[in-house]
């Protein structure tokens, strides 16, 4: 008999709506003992079967659901089915947009909670973010090897969130050859270098693909400021869109060096690209004091908020940085501003931009809305999967 997690009375509603998480406060008791990440059955207070999931005794998310089908076992065949389902959608996207790189598995939204897999050419980059994902590592890798025999697998599970579930950080090759120091990929006509081993996340922010393309329609003959530029995806796209100048700002010299290489790789005019190593907040204030002006500003900061206790501080940070950006824009200029914080709702982010405009003494029109690219889908039963939001704002 399998280990069972019994829910408290009345706490089964979210599972009946097929939400994939069980929080610790919803648990009445455990029947049997389960190790970290082990597969358990989840039942209501009367013992009625609801789901099968992974157990995490130290996490606020006490269980993450693998399946709502009682007949489905969690084994290699299960992961093979999930991979096949996910690949069908990515095949269509890759053909439509001419992609050789995309998010193959987007966690809960692809029915694999705690698992992120990005494909860069013939490299699969894996992040196992939950105890259940780690427990199923061998089965998942076996399924990947069967489905993608041409691909090498590299582990980038060096993510702090693993510590919350009692796991160590891991990184390194799993199967196949080691990724090159910089791997070229293609995106909407751009060639971009990706640092799989040492870059942010899995090496590159695939979720901003559509936003980078959208930037081109605003930048012709314009002066562009690209804040938190990382390896210059927005800068390359702006140059391809015909900008007069693009200034890329980041604290990492290594990222800026790759950004410069990306401009050169695409045979674009390097004299139109400036790379500045600096703190964005400080530099924006310095630009304001010097009365510098731009026509387009891209504001794509890292996540400011990891948990609810940080939300108020994050709101202040987002407001301050967007206020400074608005002050630097010429009349009729465009601010492309983003938040990748899952706890920051689209409505709250829009209100923050509105408040920033008031503090800047400028009127702002919202003219376009952005979200993560379509290879980062959001399943209807898990709205938390929508984490990236953005706006194009015309500043009067």
Swiss-Prot record:
Gene3D superfamilies: PUA domain, RNA methyltransferase domain (HRMD) like, Vaccinia Virus protein VP39. GO terms for cellular component: cytoplasm. It holds the Pfam family Methyltrans_SAM. It is an enzyme of class 2 (transferase). InterPro entries: PUA, PUA-like_sf, PUA_sf, RLMI, RlmI-like_PUA, SAM-dep_methyl-trfase, SAM-dependent_MTases_sf. Coiled coil: none annotated. Residues 2-79 form the PUA domain. One of its GO terms (molecular function) is RNA binding. Keywords: Cytoplasm, Methyltransferase, RNA-binding, rRNA processing, S-adenosyl-L-methionine, Transferase. It is found in: Cytoplasm. Its EC number is 2.1.1.191. Belongs to the methyltransferase superfamily. RlmI family. Specifically methylates the cytosine at position 1962 (m5C1962) of 23S rRNA. NCBIfam families: PRK15128.1. This is Ribosomal RNA large subunit methyltransferase I. The gene is rlmI.
